[in-house]
Amino acid sequence: MDGIAGRARDLGIQPEYEGIGGTIHRVPDSTLEKLVAAFGPGPAARPQALAAPPDARCHLPDGPRSWGVAVQLYQLRSARNWGIGDFADLEDLAAILGGMGADFIGLNPLHAMFLADPARCSPFSPSNRRFLNPLYLAVDRIPGFDPAMIDMDGMERLRGADLVDYPGVADAKLRALRALWDRSGQPDASPGFRRRSGADLDRHALFDAVSAHMAAAGHGAGWTGWPEAWRDPDGAKVADFAHAHAAEIAFYRWLQDQADLQLARARDACRTAGMAIGLYLDVAVGEAADGSGSWGHPDVLSGVRIGAPPDYFNEGGQDWALAPLSPAAMAASGAAPFGALMAGVMARAGAVRIDHAMGLWQLFLIPEGVGPDAGTYARYPLDDMLRALAQASNDHDTIVIGEDLGNVPPGFREVMEGANILSYRILFFERDADGGFVPPGDYPAKALACLSTHDLPTFLGWWGGHDIALRARFGLIGADAAREQSEARPGERRALVRALRDAGLWDGGDDIPGPPPPDLVAAVHRFVARTPARLMAVRLEDLARDDRPVNLPSTADEYPNWRPRLRGTVDEITGSDAFRAIIDAIRAERPGRG
């Protein structure tokens, strides 16, 4: 094939693609030209099949079906935290859940965010996936802490808030952390941590220091808004800054070292509590296009963003504003940067979830100046990506879960199964052709099963139709669609109750007015626990009988995404009858280690 379409195809860029419903989308030449320019000169992408190589199998130990609890760490309340859940809360939760038989705690991405702009709080839009968010530090657990370092009136306000006040939390924690650092003699990160983290740690700490300087000067926390001379981390301006602010950069390295130490203690707390898997960490599909991970990094495509094509829910497609890894760089290196990323995360994890796992094969890319409706897919070296992933998984004995929702290419789930990557199966989506809920036995064994995720309503929210009301309120669906969905929801509830009855888990009526009774909620969780899926996760929000979503996709400031806190403390929630009823129901199907 000649012309721009042929050159694009040589690089793995698709001149056309099949969308949901089988529609063929032809990509504008202008998009192909911009993507070809962004990819740069290089060898043609080698042809490859959608298949798992036989030498790329992730760690998947034999053993009983396990269960655990999915937690949004920032949501946790306790008498001692600072208005946001922290690593010490995680230790305490591990002791409680491990004692009840849980084998893992699933967490939202803990990636490093923008400390100079803490209101940018989506954990799926991080500054850098290699490092951690210091706002999760339990400051009071760092040696040398003195309660006099904090403003108690401000602390009580943060602790009592219904929503996480990220700017307030960041101000309180960074002030105290600087005081601790000063009192301790302004230490750097430990030599061992610096050696393990390499030059990436230095670059990230430099970014955080420059970001604070730029934000204070009104240029914003992200590098794409900085003056031109500051956009090159290897330029003279940045070099002069690094020389003049060496202590400041050491402070940011020290923060990462402290976060790594506390996460390691949480991992050890899981082991002490008897958990077979321990921490289950989430890996975002990319990094913010203006974050430290893309600041002058040769393995990241510049001027290109990850998104999603048009579908039934988003007619114009989606722009996630995330920078992708370069397919050419992955092919040239055997996907070494991806492997290093995964190895770094897996060092503290017994399991990881890869967000948008289809990115191992292809990502939907959008060049600058183009809307998502004009984007297209680009292929990655699947064999190399899978081998790098499997190597990290086996080196660290870490189970891998792939989020395989949305537009999944035919054959991709078979690739996951062949590579020992667990599928991600959600009760709300596991339906038959008539809209009924499939029986537990129809779920695959190589899977993690759950009721819902952070992008979906809680069970109480779904039952009450709160998700429909919220989407209508914020204009995500029109009045006609809202009415149709509201009229359909009672039928969906009855279908679920019938599935429970068919499974021998419910002997009550089909029509249940008002909120679902606790025994029905327990029965639904037992239904999911009965599946042959290797792992089963229950959301802490469901255990707490919360009806609010933590994230409402396609909203920004309209809804407080990633900010709702649990209404009760960890001790109050885990001590409730509703919590115990659900845990008992799960353990009836998955007794595990007793």
Region spans (language model):
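Short, solvent-exposed loop/edge-beta patches enriched in aromatic
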Residues: 62, 89-106, 264, 268-278
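Catalytic domains of carbohydrate-active enzymes, especially glycoside hydrolases
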Residues: 89-113, 347-351, 528-530
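Short acidic catalytic loops
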Residues: 102-109, 270, 278-284, 345-360
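Alpha-amylase-like alpha-glycosidases and glucanotransferases acting on alpha-linked glucans and related
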Residues: 58-63, 70, 116-260, 286-535, ...
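Structured C-terminal cap/extension of enzyme domains
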Residues: 545-594
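Conserved, well-ordered alpha-helix/loop/beta-strand core segments that scaffold catalytic motifs
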Residues: 252-286
